Regions:
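An anionic, turn-rich surface loop/hairpin at beta-sheet edges
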Residues: 98-111, 147-173
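Short beta-strand segments that buttress and anchor functional surface loops
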Residues: 122-128, 148-150, 184-189
Length: 204
């Protein structure tokens, strides 16, 4: 804080004109909060997407994949990734499997999610369900937000802090895929699937 103050003062006198210094608050950066393991997971998001689709098709779910259209197209992202504040219908699809005998395609009914403002970042919460991703949405690019969060289970009432439990840590890419449609892509989750995709549609 002291360094920041001095930098602002120096900036104010750099031109020789007495003026009120203007200090900019640093932009939030997910890289400052993420674990090394999750950096790797995010870098492999496309790899996990392609692998999960191949597993689903090999498991005789080609028609299920095709039916989802842009939602399960790895290259469907368009500009405008930032999720607006509000309530959403959110439907999870689990693609691929971490075990030989596990299902390679599971589509769950839509549940309720909410996005709220929290300074220069946003807060994402799944309101109901047995597995509830909860965490922070960071700006990354015009085509991506980064989600860092944890998985809240069953009747738990509070989320663990990100980074406390590697089995609960979650990282994902939020992308817009239509005029009023987004998705959250979660590569290599700790349980069950190779990739989770959450379909996000505004509730109103």
């Amino acid at each position: 804080m002291r360094f920041l103050f001095l930098a602002c003062v120096a900036g104010g006198f750099a031109t020789g004109v007495a003026s009120k210094p203007v200090c900019k608050t640093p932009e939030p950066d997910w890289r400052q909060d993420v674990t090394p393991a999750d950096v790797t997971r995010l870098h492999e998001v496309r790899e996990s997407f392609v692998k999960a689709l191949a597993q689903a098709r090999a498991g005789d779910h080609g028609k299920d994949v095709a039916r989802e259209g842009l939602l399960l197209d790895p290259d469907a992202a368009i500009d405008g990734a930032a999720l607006p504040v509000g309530d959403y219908h959110c439907r999870t699809i689990k693609l691929g499997s971490q075990s030989v005998s596990g299902p390679s395609f599971v589509s769950y009914p839509a549940l309720d999610c909410r996005v709220t403002a929290n300074g220069k970042v946003s807060r994402f919460v799944r309101v109901n369900g047995l597995q509830r991703p909860t965490g922070t949405l960071y700006p990354a690019s015009v085509r991506q937000q980064v989600f860092l969060g944890t998985l809240v289970l069953s009747d738990e009432t509070r989320a663990l802090n990100y980074g406390r439990d590697t089995d609960r840590n979650m990282i994902g890419a939020v992308e817009r895929i239509g005029p009023r449609r987004w998705r959250m892509v979660l590569p290599y989750p700790r349980f069950d699937s190779t990739l989770d995709v959450i379909d996000l549609v505004p509730a109103n």
